[in-house]
From Swiss-Prot:
Organism from which the protein derives: Cereibacter sphaeroides
A cellular component annotation (GO) from this entry: cytosol
Pfam families referenced in this protein's UniProt entry, alphabetically: CheW (PF01584)
Bridged cysteine pairs (disulfide): none
PROSITE patterns to which the protein is assigned, alphabetical: CHEW (PS50851)
Main location: cytoplasm
Protein name: Chemotaxis protein CheW
Reported function: Involved in the transmission of sensory signals from the chemoreceptors to the flagellar motors.
Keyword vocabulary terms for this entry: Chemotaxis, Cytoplasm
SUPFAM superfamilies cross-referenced by the UniProt entry: CheW-like
Gene that produces this protein: cheW
Localization annotation: Cytoplasm
Gene Ontology process terms (BP): chemotaxis; signal transduction
């Protein structure tokens, strides 16, 4: 019997909250999870870019993920966390309320988005994961951050 890679068997995701809504991203895109750090504002940046932080000598843009997803804007507070991700080679921080879990799931647990979803939703969300009484949206970071290379 041939060995099957972990990628084909299981998917690991980092689950997090924005308000009462739950989302997740592929763990392979996550570099680290850190507490809120005040940012330096960038003039004329899109409204969902809070600013930048210095992360061990690298300038990292911080995205207000709630605003980017159309859920209103989070006012950064000490209780919030930043998920540092790598998207197409660019390091980007995502401001969220809290990280709740690291989950290991079979690929079959990801269901497609309903066909009635808007084009924007379809470009941001790769699928829906139902887990007990919870429903998590699996985000497509490339869809959420289409201009990641032009942010800096």
């Amino acid at each position: 019997m041939a060995a099957v890679s972990l990628d084909e068997d299981l998917r690991e995701v980092v689950a997090f909250r924005i308000g009462s809504q739950e989302f997740c991203i592929d763990i392979r895109a996550v570099r680290e999870i850190r507490s809120w750090t005040p940012t330096t504002i960038l003039p004329h940046a899109p409204s969902y870019i809070i600013g930048v932080i210095n992360l061990r000598g690298s300038v990292v843009p911080i995205i207000n993920l709630a605003e980017r997803l159309g859920l209103g804007s989070l006012e950064p507070e000490a209780r919030h966390v930043i998920i540092i991700t790598v998207v197409e080679g660019q390091v980007v921080g995502l401001l969220v309320d809290a990280v709740s879990d690291i989950l290991t799931l079979p690929p079959s647990s990801v269901q497609p988005m309903p066909k009635i979803a808007s084009e924007t939703t379809l470009s941001f969300v790769r699928g829906v994961i139902t887990l007990d009484q919870r429903m998590l949206r699996l985000l497509d970071l490339i869809g959420v951050l289409p201009n990641v290379r032009r942010m800096m």
